């Protein structure tokens, strides 16, 4: 059990010598020379066994001092090694041995004593990592043996010197830590190491290296030599003036352990894992050494084990890891020990765990920090003018304090350091600025007040003093940053000192008849006393009085002053008050600097640089731009007081943009433990230093990334992601813009990879399914409807916002971030709250899409199942019997007239016989009147004309009896006039329909435009809400919250450390309050959007995919169909329905019961029972059923009622219940309205692309909504709609002579064609009976004269 316990006990040994201040380190070594050594660094360095720091195994972690934790995970900032650090490997070896007897005469070591390392924050040591295993002996690489643990030895100091050969040695006091007693003792002493002069010693000849050694066979046997290594060290150095010597016992074992050394103002601290957690790795402080001088360097002392040749052993390497100020995530077990840890600055995955203070992170996309480009240079522009002339301060007689002199400088360069170096400064105090900042800033003016003043009275001039100096002589103004310098003037400065110091001790005005009323006249800050105008330049005696009588114009009275004289000192003593005023312009006062090439901006365009422009400092990117603003004003600012443009001295206008700073997200898959990094909304070409990204969380650069091949996507630059053109329908890692990260273990079995793959989300359109009846209940039942279209916008998500808390509050300034630590886990809670809101968004959107997504789509006619007649929606089929052919239209005259409704019957009757004889027989009846069409064809004209003429001609021959032949003509005229009258009546009725129907249409249009206005207004509010919130948050950055400036850079540049903390703390408080309000608003909006997303899902499923029975849920009135399209941050619905326009009031009951015992009751289904509209109740009252959405009484049947239990609200009936009849259909046919609506409607599903990029541009739909409002106004002034009369087309057949002429013409045409084709041409015979003889004449022959060619 002893080996399992912490046995490192404090056995501090203090040995006092002759001097009480020092301890006695005797005996000194009596060796005349130092042991010989062979330094073979190559042999030690070629053996490499890497042991990187693994925080998961608690490597190198020093337990927090003075506190403990149990069963908790937290972030802790302190001194830790870097995760993955390989450290420096050191190895000890055995010595040379001649034989098996005697001591080896030569040590075999590496060159460790020649290497000096920076101590910085300290280091930790891994000891015995390979103990108990088999390894190589360095001196004999071919021999393997069991490895033993070896403790390291160190020298630590603050100053160095060299030997004559140029080898480093420690000077002055040094802390030496030496293991001894064969691993059972640890010595620590603080002495001056004086090199010994013997042979092979540091100050002697043939010096090679110093080291320590033990002789195994003699020092490590039954009696352990506790000082063997110490004595060997004394052979190289004499230990002089040692202030302490401590020793600690160690249990000898081969257990691996950790050892650490740190330093602070309390001294040097030693830490060990043996004290409290021997096998766990937690290091606890076990000693604090009184070493207060800052340690700068350390050296590993070589160590050699002298052994016999046949008993050599291998010694485990130890590893030294530097400590850094880091943030670690620590996991404390129930017993209080650290069992897991993560270096928050190691990589993006580590940062993810630390951002959410958890070792277990679920699969998702997380916002963790921000990437900010580092400055690559400096650009300075300031007046290139002469040096400010301070010579008046250095010549002449120094003025008295009441007659101080003032110098105001502008348009010059000052050297305040050079000025103050001329004086012996006794006090330098500032207000609103630091002494260092006032000497290196640019100002619009610099003012210096100077005067002779004894340093013995400097307390009277300090702020808050109420003595005579601030009352009557000089009062420092604090309106602007100011510094006060009290100094004495050396003899080599030419300024002349006055005979004595003097000041005004009294300045009053005497008034009254006897001048007995005295009024003190005090001065204002920075102003002269009124008594100064008539006071002497110096007072000849102490208490000297001086007066001046005021004129009547000045108000009368007497001014009286008293002067006090102070003896002059040996050297003139003076006071200087320096005040500066901030501003910008070409006449600024700037320090004299060696600018080098910082004046050139041309080679820095497009790069992130630190700039100082006439006193305006910052960091940004300069680009050539089109000039804006007033050139004389030089600087162009935005509404948040940020510099956006600058007119340079080279004549160009440069835009100033912030350096790249973008949010960084980590894509993490828990099942594979893989991650990728997303730089939001930035091109990869702008992220030039991504491999050394600065982490606001850890205040350091992230040191590792697994991939250096970034992939450009629509959402930003991603590393750790490859693009294989995948398409998925389900995504657990949405990136936005319809992009998804797919882990290596994907849904595709044939696919595997070692990193994430980029995929595109593919959503299908929702389908239209069978509609169901609408439902509702109202006392007034609709009897007529109008067609309405309602538009509705539902916000389903808000833009994801991630605010880097530290970046927002501190803008990257380390001083601010250190103060922010005092606010605890506030920033972590902010990040967690925003991430929670973003996860809530992802969950609600994913749930929404999952609920509304369908796997297939159908056309309209297949999607609308049931008793729907969709023939009206189809293209009419040409060729039916109801259509005339094209030949008939060509051969007959066609006349189309208005048809009041009887033309078709008349036409069918006329086809049954001769039309001229059946005209009167085919007369039609309309409302009791016989009617005929108002048209005659030629046959009927001939018949009626012949009848009329015959009756007239024969009237004289037949004594009027032939007049009866005119009766058919008269009847024909009467019936046709009746037809004209009936047509006029129908036209009159249609005029009424025109007014009524179009008025209804206009009402629906007005309602539609009104809902469009409301919907657009909601879209505008939803889109602008995020931009307005971000603008408000950004505007708070310009709020000073009571500090001297809203810029931390200005505060750091102007104030000292104490004042910086107070001013920055005000900004932190204010900005955290603003950020907290913003986060609270985001959480509320996120929850509201999530609830709205559920509502949108319900509406898609109930309104778009089916017909809703809820009145008013899917638009106004009775729902018919709805459509949805994508809109910013939500869905835009178009609901189509019927809105009642007329109602009838009926007497209704909730149910009906008889008087049986128990009573038998029935209740209506989707309607209610109504009476027969009688005015009184009686036994014979008849009850009917009507639907609640349309008034149409019908008998009570099994289809419209059901049996229920009795209820007091049901109507009691005296008679028996009517027996239910068979089902009676009461469907209402809306095919006309459906035809008009579906005629030009195209429905498709929305593109469910996630909107991830924050848009701070405000959406303004006011103009569009104003236009819609004007349309509504104009619709109120115009009404028209037409109901078209039925058309009748009449074909009039041609008479016989027209047909005869038509046939003759055709015969003539055919003969002409025949003779042209068959009876023309030479030798042609027509039908073999005609022959052409001389129809082809031959041509005459001519003699042709021959032509001879010579």
From Swiss-Prot:
Specific enzymatic cleavages in vivo yield mature proteins. The keyword Phosphoprotein does not apply. Residues 386-592 form the BetaCoV S1-CTD domain. Disulfide bonds join 191-242, 344-354, 388-412, 430-483, 442-590, 909-922. Gene3D superfamilies: 1.20.5.300, 2.20.210.30, 3.30.70.1840, Spike glycoprotein, N-terminal domain. The record marks 749-750, 884-885 as: Cleavage. Belongs to the betacoronaviruses spike protein family. This is Spike glycoprotein.
